[in-house]
Amino acid sequence: DKIELEVTKHWEDNSNINGKRPISIKYLVSGNNKTKEEIVTGNTTTDENWNYKFTDLPKYDSQGNEIVYTIDEQEVTPGDLKFYNKSITGLNIVNTFHVPDERISVNVSKHWEDNNNINGKRPESIKYVLTGEGNVTEQVVTGNTTSDTDWNYTFANLPKYNSQGNEIIYTIEEQETNQNDLKFYVKQANGNYKNGFNMVNTFKVPLETVDISVNKHWVDDNNANG
């Protein structure tokens, strides 16, 4: 005797609003130490075309016992279901959108272009400001005033994805710890959050001008001699 088993699927992802649903999936039906596989391509915004019927499955094993079949699904391409949790009840598979709680670290390094602070204008500390998805993390770092030692910092345990499953893009900025700490420096940020940021501070005297008032007084009896 032969039987048929139809696998049904439901996506809990608000019609794929975040664009993370794969275009295809692999179904597996296993029984009596044998497995059949089938790749199914379905609609990326509805549940349409995601069901599949396995046919011509033996009902009994060689001892006449009814075979118990189980189903499962696998990714066609690695990462296809990264943003989904799956739940299997009988022959129904439910995939629920879920953002994994992955964490990353962002490294910040610094280089001073000031001839080892020969002019004595380098500050003792600096504030690094890391921004991602509107969230701001600040860190004050105190470093060596004649070298690049101790100016690096690592922002750790940062969320990798936002609530839509998109990778968060982090940007870096530095600020003065005290007013005018960087008055004699031009700052430049290089790199990115994936490979690390490098902050370069180059010594430069600002082009500031001052006004000088000159007062004159004539001691000549009001120019009596012409």
Predicted regions, residues:
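Solvent-exposed loop/turn and edge beta-strand elements of beta-rich ligand-binding domains
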Residues: 1-226
